[in-house]
Amino acid sequence: MGIGHNPRLCLVPLILGLLCGGVGMTPLPEAGPQSPCSLEGVEIKGGSFRLLKAGQVLEYLCPSGFYPYPTQIRTCRSTGSWSTLQTQDRKIVKRAECKAIRCPRPQDFENGEYWPRAAYYNLSDEISFRCYDGYTLRGSANRTCQGNGRWDGETAICDDGATYCPNPGIPLGTRKVGSQYRLEDRVTYYCNRGLTLRGSEQRTCLEGGSWSGTEPSCQDSFMYDTPAEVAEAFLSSLTETIEGVDAEDGHSPGEQQKRKIVLDPSGSMNIYLVLDGSDSVGAHNFTGAKNCLRDFIEKVASYGVKPKYGLVTYATEPKVLIRVSDPKSSEADWVTDQLNQINYADHKLKAGTNTKRALLEVYNMMSREVNQFKETWNRTRHVIIIMTDGLHNMGGDPVTVIHDIRYLLDIGRNRKNPREDYLDIYVFGVGPLVNQENINALASKKDKEKHVFKLQGMENLEDVFVQMLDESRTLGLCGMVWEHKDGTAYHKQPWQAKISVTRPSKGHESCMGAIVSEYFVLTAAHCFTVDDEKHSIKVSLGGQRKEWEVKEILFHPKYDLNAKKAKGIPEFYDYDVALVRLKEKLKYETTIRPICLPCTEGSIQALRLPRSTTCQQQMQELLPAKDIEALFVSESKKTLTRKAVYIKNGDKKASCERDALRAPGYEKVKDVSEVVTPRFLCTGGVDPYADPNTCKGDSGGPLIIHKRSRFIQVGVISWGVVDVCKRPQQVPGYARDFHINLYQVLPWLKEKLQNEDLGFL
């Protein structure tokens, strides 16, 4: 019926890909067993402790759902004793203990009522809100106490709509002074003793009916932002900034444009990365933050966004690694190379913390831009991303530089045109040493946005960037995946399709395919026969139970399995490609996305090649004359697995192709070119490495090159020399697989997919 194990009709996917590789779980490096301070009597009831920073710092650890009271951190003093156990309101405590995490109770609720009323609320407790007659509820009517000591949902507000500005509400745990909401009226928020206010202490009713600043919250020392909360808030805020840049060029930021943002190469957005390398941060956190910034840059670039970058690391003194004026500051690869070269040890000899000097370097970069581009500087949007613990012990208050930056950029000076959209300062605080008050003072404060975040450890920062840079706005980009540790096989191979054919005499037979557009799946022609009825063909996608119906099968016109039977060649797989047109248009989601096709605008963007790149130049980039790392996706035990292979396209190509003559049915073929035409790519064998081989149900699946965090299909799995999956322990060295080279069938693909908005070159 087929050559080797074919046809394979059996069952066989600012601001980041897999981020922060190598970032461990410990906030700071653990010290040895010795400490200058005695460990006698430092135990915590219900928990444990560990030493950090060569025994100079002691961190208390508690089980999930509990927090260290009265403090998480103690420092070893020069007197040889540990810092006193005292609460944030300076109450002395004799012994540390792990207390249950609770959520703050409402201090007040205007124009309505809530229940149940309690002195405190435990994890998973719920609270409900109701408004009096004449008032309408905004926000969440029901809220649940979460594991980080915060309530889910949004602040519940009862408003009658009769005031110039809407009632700004009283976030749970805060107190508000001021109940008049006329133009220029102000409200002030307070926290109870021992809690830190994050957000805006004072808010003013502005023209247009909005409030200045951002909604406040009262934070206890044990409270952290979850990765999901940070990702959603940061992405939402940063996306608005980027879309604003797009709108400056006269484009409406529609859904499609949100997915394909291309910034003005002259620099309509500048991103400044500021990384704290001081002694209080520690080598582990510094390296982890550096890795996250590296992958942030990589991921942003994979979306086709090209801002200009500035990079500053600092301790006692700042080091400017990249200036936005550098010729290559918008080239992600070069920026990443510069970032990779920095080390925590660069600041070892002067390990103080001078945040003000670091921000002055950012100010100086902005000032040069203002002076150099006098005509256009006021259309440039600036994003500052600061990674720090918020501690500073020299140089003065860094907030003064923030004020200078705002003045330089003419932000907040004109009430009718405050230009707040042109500056966003995000501060990420990581680990147990974070000073919440200081990081809040540095960050931007905007209505309905969050710019300051405190995370529990580096692994949480990793989660933030994974979630933050892979949201619904990018679903239309080809070759994108969600590589997060919690992702399913179809999150990681979202293009993968399973095609099932029901034949009355043979039952069910299956192939693989790849989503290439909203209507089409690319697969192998030999997966079908001329007698197959459309209603007997079903397509499964995204690991879902739903089956998509087929409208038609489009074969390559030169495909003919029986073309060389007269020459004694039973099956001939040249031009073994087909397109499956679906009846229903696909709605892209995280488990259903297209793969990139060669010589399209999508693959040019994915590879970050110049727009002037030709199809031939792209082919030389992806398929040079050498062994090429590639992969295919195989199904085993109902799960998808990537298999790494090498395309033999150099000096091993001829020997790879010659092994085709060892396939059953080809024994009498003298000239390998009779069965292996220029349309084929060859993988398999044991040189330079033992490649895995495809199995029966893998036919029609994509042969893929993974480059620059994107996945580009270069081939379609067609046939193999040996069915190795019948005897996986006895794989001969001549086991080879052959794939249709998509570059060789591009005219046909371009013709059939011309209405799919793929932008063929």
UniProtKB/Swiss-Prot annotation:
Sushi domain mapped to chain residues: 35-100, 101-160, 163-220
Active site: H526, D576, S699
Domain of life: Eukaryota
Domain VWFA: from-to ranges: 270-469
Record-annotated Peptidase S1 domain positions: 477-754
GO cellular component: extracellular region
Posttranslational modification: Cleaved by CFD following activation of the alternative complement system, generating Ba and Bb chains. Cleavage and activation takes place when CFB is already associated with complement C3b.
Cystine crosslinks: C37-C76, C62-C98, C103-C145, C131-C158, C165-C205, C191-C218, C478-C596, C511-C527, C599-C615, C656-C682, C695-C725
Domain notes: The unliganded VWA domain has an inactive 'locked' conformation whereby the scissile Arg-259|Lys-260 bond is protected from proteolytic activation.
Protein's name in the database: Complement factor B
Gene (name only): CFB
